[in-house]
């Protein structure tokens, strides 16, 4: 049996590394014992209009338990073809790259083509109510946002149990957080322009396809050895054009250091501007080689923002006073923004772009499309060609182990937050 033909039984193949990582998973027999049987209910008749019912056709029988959800199911005349998933054993596991809140990422080799890929094993062991919403969002967003600067999704593969599901993605050698830690000096201005232009291009494409990323940070920006940026980790992404329920949108998004002030102050509705604030934080981090707002909690995060931008006013942020947490804050004494003092060597155009990204009022914050046209990218020095970037040893490929960068994790409660139900589906 070929590797691509589907999962093989344990007796028909040797034990592999994929089995080692799943010792804590339930066996198929144990999984079946956990499946609750639906209580039996009597079928009832649905009264169809006589003129719509073909002659000699009996009344439609349906399960009474479904009536609370829908009284009419439109007929389906076409069923799209479904392609069965390949087995994870079609890949040779090479090494583990990282483990996050929502999955474990491995580097692997396709046994048929020899391609090196990244496999993200979804954490399904603790799921009690089906497939996790974060995984559905990530798959949906990766498919909707195919772009040269977004990590590519290849396929979904499965193991031998229902808890073994993997997303196969392009392997990228580095992430910007690790590179900033490794590099003795910050990126050059010409290199920062290239990185920022690629990031803005990817974000503009996502927003054009109605996708909010909601967790942009340097550790989620991958870069290959040819200087090309790939935006990754869409686990917190959602479609922002969807209707918002009465509870609003969840505030448990965006890693703290990159979280927009409107979210920190309890806003229940937000837009693409939250991603643009994160882009501004990334821009500043590339310039300083350290995070701009490394707060330990929400209050300290706001304090660091107020220190750089000055406290918000009715003029700089007209909607500030209406946010849920605004009245509980004691604002510092008003002062002018400190961009020039913090970013000493930036040009006037560079400071202008940074300040327009880190703007209090979400409605005035620059968009990705507008930022791509900013004069900063056309002034000297010009953006460096990606092929001219220096190369570095890849930690993900196991070339040179080093200390893991100190970076906060994404909000752990987001996957289980009560608003992430039908109010926040992709």
Predicted regions mapped to residue ranges:
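Conserved N-lobe beta3->alphaC-helix segment of eukaryotic protein kinase catalytic domains
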Residues: 116, 121-146
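Intrinsically disordered, low-complexity regulatory segments that flank or precede the catalytic domain
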Residues: 1-88, 425-426
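C-terminal lobe substrate-recognition/regulatory segment of protein kinase catalytic domains
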Residues: 312-355
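C-terminal intrinsically disordered, low-complexity extensions immediately downstream
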Residues: 382-426
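Conserved N-lobe ATP-binding subsite of Hanks-type protein kinase domains
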Residues: 104
């Amino acid at each position: 049996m070929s590797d691509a033909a589907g999962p093989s039984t344990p007796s028909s193949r040797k034990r592999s590394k994929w089995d080692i990582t799943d010792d804590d998973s339930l066996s198929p027999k144990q999984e079946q014992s956990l499946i609750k049987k639906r209580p039996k209910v009597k079928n009832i008749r649905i009264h169809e209009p006589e003129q719509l019912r073909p002659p000699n056709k009996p009344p439609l029988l349906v399960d009474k338990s479904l009536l609370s959800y829908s009284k009419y199911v439109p007929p389906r005349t076409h069923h799209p073809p479904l392609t069965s998933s390949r087995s994870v054993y079609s890949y040779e596991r090479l090494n583990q790259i990282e483990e996050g809140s929502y999955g474990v990422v491995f580097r692997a080799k396709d046994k048929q083509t020899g391609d090196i890929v990244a496999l993200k094993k979804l954490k399904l062991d603790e799921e009690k109510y089906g497939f996790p919403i974060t995984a559905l969002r990530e798959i949906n967003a990766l498919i909707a946002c195919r772009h040269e600067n977004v990590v590519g999704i290849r396929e979904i593969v499965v193991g031998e149990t229902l808890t073994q599901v993997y997303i196969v993605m392009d392997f990228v050698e580095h992430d910007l957080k690790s590179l900033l830690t490794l590099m003795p000096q910050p990126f050059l201005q010409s290199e920062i322009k290239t990185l920022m232009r690629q990031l803005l291009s990817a974000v503009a494409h996502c927003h054009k396809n109605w996708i909010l990323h909601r967790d942009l940070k340097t550790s989620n920006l991958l870069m290959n050895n040819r200087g090309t940026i790939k935006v990754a980790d869409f686990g917190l992404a959602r479609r922002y054009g969807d209707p918002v329920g009465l509870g609003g949108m969840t505030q448990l998004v965006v890693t703290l250091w990159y979280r927009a002030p409107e979210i920190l102050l309890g806003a229940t509705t937000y837009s693409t501007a939250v991603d643009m604030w994160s882009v501004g934080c990334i821009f500043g981090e590339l310039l300083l080689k350290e995070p701009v707002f490394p707060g330990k909690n929400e209050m300290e995060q706001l304090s660091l923002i107020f220190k750089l931008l000055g406290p918000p006013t009715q003029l700089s942020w007209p909607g500030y006073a209406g946010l849920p947490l605004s009245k509980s804050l004691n604002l510092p004494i008003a002062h002018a923004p400190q961009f020039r003092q913090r970013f000493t060597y930036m040009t006037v155009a560079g400071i202008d772009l940074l300040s327009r990204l880190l703007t209090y009022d979400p409605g005035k914050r620059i968009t990705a499309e507008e930022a791509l046209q900013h004069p900063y990218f056309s002034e000297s020095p010009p953006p460096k060609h990606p092929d001219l970037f220096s190369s570095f040893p890849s930690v993900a490929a196991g070339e040179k182990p080093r200390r893991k960068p100190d970076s906060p994790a994404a909000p752990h409660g987001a996957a289980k937050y009560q608003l992430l139900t039908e109010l926040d589906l992709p």
